[in-house]
Swiss-Prot record:
Enzyme class at the top of the EC tree: lyase
Keyword DNA repair: no
Catalysed reactions, as listed in the record: an N-(acyl)-sphingosylphosphocholine = an N-(acyl)-sphingosyl-1,3-cyclic phosphate + choline; an N-(acyl)-sphingosylphosphoethanolamine = an N-(acyl)-sphingosyl-1,3-cyclic phosphate + ethanolamine; a 1-acyl-sn-glycero-3-phosphocholine = a 1-acyl-sn-glycero-2,3-cyclic phosphate + choline; a 1-acyl-sn-glycero-3-phosphoethanolamine = a 1-acyl-sn-glycero-2,3-cyclic phosphate + ethanolamine
Full protein name: Dermonecrotic toxin LgSicTox-beta-LOXN3
MF-aspect GO terms: lyase activity; metal ion binding; toxin activity
Length: 7
């Protein structure tokens, strides 16, 4: 899973 989150 991607741990990147939109700002």
């Amino acid at each position: 899973a991607d741990s990147r989150k939109p700002i």
